[in-house]
Curated annotation (Swiss-Prot):
Domain of life the protein comes from: Bacteria
Subunit structure: Part of the 50S ribosomal subunit; part of the 5S rRNA/L5/L18/L25 subcomplex. Contacts the 5S rRNA. Binds to the 5S rRNA independently of L5 and L18.
Coiled-coil regions listed: none
The keyword Ligase is assigned to this record: no
Name of protein: Large ribosomal subunit protein bL25B
Task of the protein: This is one of the proteins that binds to the 5S RNA in the ribosome where it forms part of the central protuberance.
Length: 194
């Protein structure tokens, strides 16, 4: 997807005026790249994030430049009440070097675990990965369909496509698995003494 960007002035007043006019202030930076303050249309950015999420290669055409810049969204800041994007950081990438970015975790097999009486609680929704810009995954997956016992499932069990390295500590808990109704059964068996 392509975004159109316009170079902008800096400062909180200028940023506030941009937001009121329907734009999001942002910055493009990266290794060997002079940081450039830009603005993008709020509707265009929101649509892109809604359709593709944050972990995708984006072509940003900066007004006055001949070629689009290859970037990824490094950080989105949102208004705490409205959830509208208030600022965006774009990391300009070198197509021949690896980058670090955050991608979502997709848990598969929850229905099978539920049929076995297990409840899956999500502890971590996204994870940092390292890969080339052309290998950015939609997500990394965690398959819980084979779980038969309660307990934690860690980042060591995440599955990433070839060329993608998960940077999360392997011992970090991604989901917790508990027995459905386990607490109630225990209370019933230790009921009041006669």
């Amino acid at each position: 997807m392509q975004l159109e960007a316009t170079p902008r002035g800096t400062g909180s007043r200028a940023s506030r005026r941009l937001r009121q006019a329907g734009f999001v202030p942002g910055i493009i930076y990266g290794p060997g790249v002079e940081p450039l303050a830009v603005s993008v249309r709020s509707t265009q950015l929101e649509r892109l994030v809604e359709r593709q999420g944050r972990g995708h290669l984006i072509h940003v055409q900066v007004e006055g430049e001949a070629n689009p810049r290859q970037v990824v969204i490094k950080q989105l800041q949102r208004d705490i009440l409205t959830q509208q994007v208030t600022h965006v950081d774009f990391l300009q990438v070198d197509m021949n070097r690896t980058i670090t970015l955050t991608v979502p975790i997709v848990v598969v097999g929850e229905e099978q675990a539920r049929r076995r009486g297990l409840l899956i609680t999500h502890e971590l929704d996204e994870v940092e990965v390292e890969c080339r810009p052309t290998e950015i995954p939609e997500a990394v997956t965690l398959d819980v369909s084979g779980l038969t016992e309660p307990g934690p499932v860690t980042a060591a069990s995440l599955s990433a496509p070839p060329g993608v390295r998960v940077l999360e500590d392997p011992d970090t808990v991604v989901v917790s698995c508990t027995v459905i109704g386990g607490g109630e059964e225990e209370e019933a068996s230790t009921g009041p003494a006669a």
